[in-house]
């Protein structure tokens, strides 16, 4: 075991402790998969990232991403958070405006706009949802069929059952049966905000999002980049969302996550602010 630089970064927020925290071991060299998984299980955060030298010559760094239950090939908030930590720890990208991360899905491009980072959404696979799955999921959510607008399987490295609901209020009212969902699917729900509603701090947000991932030992994720990427690719392509919008997530968990979506030249970019809250060392 040795002392390694370590950070906890709050992602999808410009205000510390209001987003989704991410643990980042800045140098994971020499650790095996079992050691990484055990540490991720111990942190109990949605994801823990281990930064490594890239093996692809086009990449600036490599990230291995773990939930408390298993390693994932890609996730959004770890992509933004690990890039922020890499830059803050002296990382120098090959390009002034772009950083390239190597992870399980290959190369992910990140764009820098001042303090904000955005990643280009990886390729999405979509599929129709079978009633044999949809019915039990709606039951586990306590969701009336009339409140559901559309459903899709969405896979960009993580497989989500995406549900478009009739309103943000419906999204926020859900009281899921997490043990039931654990055996069914990871579920992402999104609903539009009513622009005619009373003024609030989320007036500029177009959608409300929630992510239920009990299968990854995360009953509700505070803010989820991979899910927001997949939802944006689906909804924008099908004309169900504008080309640029802001999504709010984490409201029921007393967070204020903000995810910035932009469609540019056929690509979906998913952006957010991040704040390093803890910086020190860990013995691993």
Predicted regions and their residues:
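Active-site proximal loop and beta-alpha junction motif in alpha/beta enzyme cores
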Residues: 1-74, 80-284
